[in-house]
Regions:
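N-terminal targeting signals for export/organelle localization
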Residues: 1-55, 180
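A short beta-strand-turn-helix
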Residues: 50-53, 58-79, 103
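Short pre-active-site segment immediately N-terminal to redox-active cysteine/selenocysteine motifs
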Residues: 77-79, 84-87, 151, 161
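Structural microenvironment flanking redox-active thiols in thiol-disulfide oxidoreductases
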Residues: 92-129, 139-146
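Thiol/disulfide oxidoreductase modules built on the thioredoxin-like
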Residues: 124-132, 138-184
Length: 185
């Protein structure tokens, strides 16, 4: 396993209103190119132990235009959640391949979760890497804590039934990423 970056940076918190929900049929096209803020319901805040076969925990993404995406709305589609940071060299190394996969597979939902950084630095990174997928702002580290993420990059692969199929801590090579995505398609 490649080394992962320590997740110890901090940033300000943010939350949003409850508004119109998104339908899974609208994804990933309508979900992309936004910077939703992560929110974890109080009843779901207990960290999980990452293991294959366990259910993915509940979380919500709140977009700046008021749209809300609940993690349960992702059922029916394969999902990759990638935890990363702009200051993390291994995250930079793997991002081009993740973006390539997001562009190549319209059925795959990729959520790029930035941990504890501000919007402007994240926006610059997203533009530099041509990130077409949603770049989730986990400014308080709620999703990081919920998924028990210890270092970055870490990728979680969730099947269409909402179960964690696998996860990887460290840089994913193109062949490793292909293999893990094959398991959830």
């Amino acid at each position: 396993v490649s080394p992962a970056c320590s997740a110890s940076h901090t940033a300000s918190s943010s939350s949003g209103p409850e508004a119109g929900k998104m339908a899974v049929a609208d994804m990933p096209q309508d979900i992309g190119r936004g910077f939703p803020v992560a929110s974890v319901p109080e009843e779901s805040q207990r960290p999980i132990t990452l293991k294959a076969g366990s259910s993915s925990p509940q979380f919500t993404l709140i977009f700046s235009d008021g749209r809300i995406l609940d993690s349960s709305d992702l059922r029916g589609r394969p999902v990759m959640i990638n935890f990363w940071a702009t200051w993390c060299p291994p995250c930079r190394d793997e991002m081009p391949e993740i973006v390539r996969q997001a562009k190549a597979d319209e059925d795959l939902i990729v959520l790029a979760v930035n941990v504890r950084e501000g919007l402007e630095i994240v926006r610059t990174f997203a533009e530099e890497y041509d990130m077409i997928m949603p770049v989730v702002l986990d400014q308080r580290g709620d999703l990081q804590n919920l998924f028990s993420i210890r270092g970055m990059p870490t990728s979680i692969f969730i099947d269409s039934e909402g179960s964690i199929a696998s996860y990887w801590e460290g840089v994913l090579s193109a062949s490793q990423l292909d293999s893990m995505l094959t398991d959830i398609r």
